[in-house]
Amino acid sequence: MTGISLPPELQRVHMVGIGGAGMSGVARILLDRGGLVSGSDAKESRGVVALRARGAEIRIGHDASSLDLLPGGPTAVVTTHAAIPKTNPELVEARKRGIPVILRPVVLAKLMTGYTTLMVTGTHGKTTTTSMLIVALQHSGFDPSFAVGGELGEAGTNAHHGSGTTFVAEADESDGSLLEYTPNVAVVTNIEADHLDFFGSEQAYTAVFDSFVERIAPGGALVVCTDDPGAAALADRTDALGIRVLRYGSTGDNLAGTLLSWEQQGTGAVAHIRLAGEHNPRAVRLSVPGRHMALNALAALLAAREIGAPTDSVLDGLAGFEGVRRRFELVGTAAGARVFDDYAHHPTEVRATLEAARTVVDQNGGRVVVAFQPHLYSRTATFAHEFGAALSVADQVVVLDVYAAREQPMAGVSGATVADHVTAPVTYVPDFSAVAAHVASIARSGDVILTMGAGDVTMLGGEILSELRLKDNRGMPGAGAS
């Protein structure tokens, strides 16, 4: 939207950890709105390369002198909540110089000032639902600004400064930062215990969603999935606040949108829905598999309709939705097996993705093979049993060691902690460099192979394809055979 200038403190910004999914999106919007941006990151990445091409000055590695990448220095330094330690030399130097240090969610909230804002949150499905909503609005004649935690297949980016008056964003609940926002339309996909390392208890985690809903702007609405017990309870509590609630799901009373049925078609699906006030069902065609994707699409439809998007154009937009990077993303095919990559790192996400894979593979008589990398020692310890049960949906399971991210190792917790609870055939492979060859050795033609997790397991897809091609060329058992 033209006519809204950047706040003075955001006109010259240095960003610590600029290559991350959330940070790079904010940087892109700042640049597109005429701001000057510098930054630093621990390593080169696609995000860093893309931002440099748009004019950002970026240094690899962290050093106090990076604050001088912009002539005259920055008006603010932006950082994230947990990934960047307070001892980072650039943050130390900023405080020494008296330069304000601002968290990313605060910056995003400032960038949304003056817009009609639609925000999506929940334990699972945030990125995909946000992306579906963006694509639906674009197809309906809107040009929304947006910031999302993944790369849209259609746009090839995670953020955009649009010409319209609408801003769509993903609201991350993991650190409570969603309380920086005041949405006009809020979508809550589900609520289930997670991020207990930050919140300390399930009750504290759940409470942040109540606080978020209380921040909905006057005249706004909550779109919420009542198939999920946690979200359904939130809807009931929200009724008492006088906020308009649009419920969606497959069962329940007073639903604004009902998922009647869905059926798998190739790697996509067709969902049949009924909207409140309409007698005849409608069909929603999707290129992504799984019942959970049908529910995400229904949420996007209801949210888009709230700001005037025509139903038919929204449905057409959803039919063209190509997915999000690292959400059941096809990496390639070799030796008759298809390799997908997925970000799932919570038991519920793991189960939903594997069940979606099951519907795809059952059409071809193959098997579901998953290489799963647990993410965070605290999450692994808390949900080891649940991870084991979810992974057991697959036919063959390979468990990697834990991706620590920001955490220190925890005694007695490893990938084996998860593998011990898997009832399907399972192998624990702690040596990362050996995983691709092992997966290829057990794969058969017709299989769907998934690399799964929020860490560097995403790097393995290409390696598995290479190993499968070698296996196929050598005529080893299993290659090219069902």
From Swiss-Prot:
MF (Gene Ontology): ATP binding; UDP-N-acetylmuramate-L-alanine ligase activity
Gene3D superfamilies, sorted: Mur ligase, C-terminal domain, Mur-like, catalytic domain, NAD(P)-binding Rossmann-like Domain
Cellular-component GO terms for this entry: cytoplasm
GO process terms (BP): cell division; cell wall organization; peptidoglycan biosynthetic process; regulation of cell shape
Localization: Cytoplasm
Pathway: Cell wall biogenesis; peptidoglycan biosynthesis
Catalysed reactions, semicolon-separated: UDP-N-acetyl-alpha-D-muramate + L-alanine + ATP = UDP-N-acetyl-alpha-D-muramoyl-L-alanine + ADP + phosphate + H(+)
Residue ranges that the Swiss-Prot or TrEMBL entry lists as coiled coil: none
Keywords: ATP-binding, Cell cycle, Cell division, Cell shape, Cell wall biogenesis/degradation, Cytoplasm, Ligase, Nucleotide-binding, Peptidoglycan synthesis
The EC number(s) this enzyme carries: 6.3.2.8
Residues that bind ATP: 122-128
Enzyme class: ligase
PANTHER family the UniProt entry points to: UDP-N-ACETYLMURAMATE--L-ALANINE LIGASE, UDP-N-ACETYLMURAMATE--L-ALANINE LIGASE-RELATED
Role, per record: Cell wall formation.
UniProt similarity note: Belongs to the MurCDEF family.
HAMAP family: MurC (MF_00046)
Protein name per Swiss-Prot or TrEMBL: UDP-N-acetylmuramate--L-alanine ligase
Species of the source: Mycolicibacterium smegmatis (strain ATCC 700084 / mc(2)155)
Taxonomic lineage: Bacteria, Bacillati, Actinomycetota, Actinomycetes, Mycobacteriales
The encoding gene: murC
